[in-house]
Amino acid sequence: IPTEICRLFPKEDVIEVGYCSPTAFFHDVGEFDKERGGYYVDLSRKILIFLDQPHTMLLEHLRPMLSHDSKEITIKVTDKAEKHGMKTKNIFLLGYPSVVFCTAGMKIDEQEATRFLLLSPEIHQEKIREAIHEKIKRESDVTSYKSALSGNYDRFLLMQRIEAIKQAHITDIQISEEDAGELEKYFLEKVTSVKPRHQRDIGKVIGLVKVFALLNLWFRERMGATITANKEDIFNAYMLWDKISESQDLNLPPYVYNL
């Protein structure tokens, strides 16, 4: 699913990675900066997709970035030098990216579980039948299938909208004081007792509000590179979060929670 969705976005904004070691990832994605004496890795406004669960150490390195602790973080990694054994290297990581990783495994560290939205595809009978039908259509005639997909007008309009959002260069999305109060009231009403992880969960809800605002930026109050979310964005975020909040609270993907 992520690999298909990422095709809606400009190619230059998507980074797809299979397995790689933590050091290899930074070397491959980054560029050496002589002045700063380290590798500069610019992940800002990128979509980073790991096609399998990333190396544990790589996720550990990325945790401050995933938590939005700082726009730029410095990481020190060790690497084998040709003559002098192990050598420390500086990595300057610039965010923020949107990060997706796929795994069929059930063991996810709580550190990652609270930083990510845990999602799973629908697996009811009708959905599986549709998937089988699409698989047959695709494999029977790949060229015609891709041509039909490219010619889908709704898909084309969505891709154009995404490109237009990129070209708008929005740098900040605000929520009014009144709407922020409503957001807090809604969130606290949904939890019986607050936990430390809820500090990250409310961040996810706010992120959803901002996503809906960005998708409709032409119809939102705008001042320069800043837009303001409205009540419709908050309502849509509520509706989406309600569907997954209970499973997220238990660190479970919806599929497992609904068994």
What are these model-predicted stretches?
Residues I1-A131, K137-A148:
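Conserved ASCE/P-loop NTPase catalytic core
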Residues N90-P97, A104-L259:
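Phosphate-sensing "switch" segment of ASCE/P-loop ATPases
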